[in-house]
């Protein structure tokens, strides 16, 4: 598949000298321990509601980004929203403590949102998780959890045989399904409080990803601060209503102009299957401009774009055409894997930082 913009960089190698030196025996290099990330202590201090992006791409290839994944940190617990392929690797790059993950929330069952669920099962167990990992989701989550448990149960037994019970707790290794949304029947008007934990309330709400049903977003409210994660969605009144007054809205972005160009190129190349997909996807993903309009209507403080389609071109000027005209520059950000947003308790501040460097 040809990318929309192809950057060809020619590197000229210096000519070898006529006489090459004799090869040297390789020198042993000492192992240098990786320094601990001090941010991993700070983010669990209980002073703020925190958001971390751990996957910001889509099924279209982008080597610098994992597929869909967002983390919300509350107190000493972390909650993962979607577990797209490569997302666990990004958490490892951040040195994120897997034992702090207290639950997973699935927005819908496309592969780019669930592909690393098995890795989360295994890696959090190895990191020290000592209770079954809840996986919250709408109708269908039980089948998802059953499948990943079956696929990974032998892995857990093999690791127990090798490392012993001091490392592997076989009884707590499985995922456990937490299904909700009996009223989520595609009317795009339903919401449900699915978790209360101290000062934290998590609400699931229907979104329009038709024909994908059910599909949901999540709202996290804690001590007067709030974060909304839309999942994959188009415009809907229910989406806007549940984003009302949020400090942060994390939502996807599909650039219809660039996807249209991709469709034309694929048709011209005779790749009709890929062209058909490019023609189909704009009708169930929100554009950057429509996301900005939704954020404005809902009174959102910071709009964070993620799940970029196509993510390899996200920094091209046409991608966010029109957004700057309706939303000030300091109220929206192009998300990357490692973006961190802090919402301190008892404050209205919205603070941005990074756990991984922003790509060029």
Region spans (language model):
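Cap/insert and terminal regions of metallo-dependent hydrolase folds
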Residues: 19-20, 216-217, 223-228, 234-338
